């Protein structure tokens, strides 16, 4: 019984790989690093807009903290690239670009206040969940490849992303979601 398909075998319905396709776990690891590196660098440019558009001090402080963390995460990724003899290179992440485009649209489509804050939290949690998935995968790849320094740095970042996600949930559930819900009631009274 065959369990693997050689790369030269034709499979009905299978996509033809690009010439620079990943051929092994190390290639996937390196591509993933480039992808999340792009994402973190873009976040350092987009988080200030979220800070500017948030109104709740607790959310503003959380977003500022996330900005500082993203800068630290960029540095960690650069260390991982260097440890692996690679030049730090960003590869556009279509998924993160889409999430951030959605976040920008959400900000433009909401009034400043609790409703916008709830939207910013929702958007930022989508970012965090993508990052958690990516860093978790990269951590597993690094461990499998025996890249222990990289695995440790990725685990640190993964833990921070999970804590940030929990913080955002706490902010949303403690006040912002209820305040945004009250805005619904006021809108319904006016209608």
Give the residues covered by each predicted segment.
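Amphipathic alpha-helical hairpins
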Residues: 2-191
């Amino acid at each position: 019984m065959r369990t693997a398909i050689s790369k030269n075998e034709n499979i009905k319905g299978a996509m033809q790989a690009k010439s620079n396709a990943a051929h092994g776990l190390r290639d996937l690891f390196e591509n993933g690093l480039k992808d999340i590196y792009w994402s973190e660098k873009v976040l350092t440019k987009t988080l200030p807009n979220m800070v500017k558009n948030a109104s709740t001090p607790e959310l503003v402080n959380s977003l500022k903290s996330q900005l500082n963390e993203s800068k630290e995460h960029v540095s960690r990724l650069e260390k991982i690239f260097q440890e692996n003899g690679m030049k730090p290179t960003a590869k556009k992440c279509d998924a993160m670009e889409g999430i951030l485009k959605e976040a920008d649209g959400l900000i433009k489509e909401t009034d400043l206040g609790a409703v916008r804050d709830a939207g910013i939290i929702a958007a930022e949690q989508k970012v965090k969940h993508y990052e958690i998935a990516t860093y978790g995968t990269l951590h597993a790849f690094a461990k499998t490849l025996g890249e222990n320094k990289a695995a440790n740095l990725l685990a640190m970042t993964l833990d921070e992303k999970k804590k940030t996600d929990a913080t955002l949930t706490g902010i949303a559930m403690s006040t912002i979601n209820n305040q945004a819900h009250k805005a619904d009631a006021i809108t319904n009274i006016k209608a």
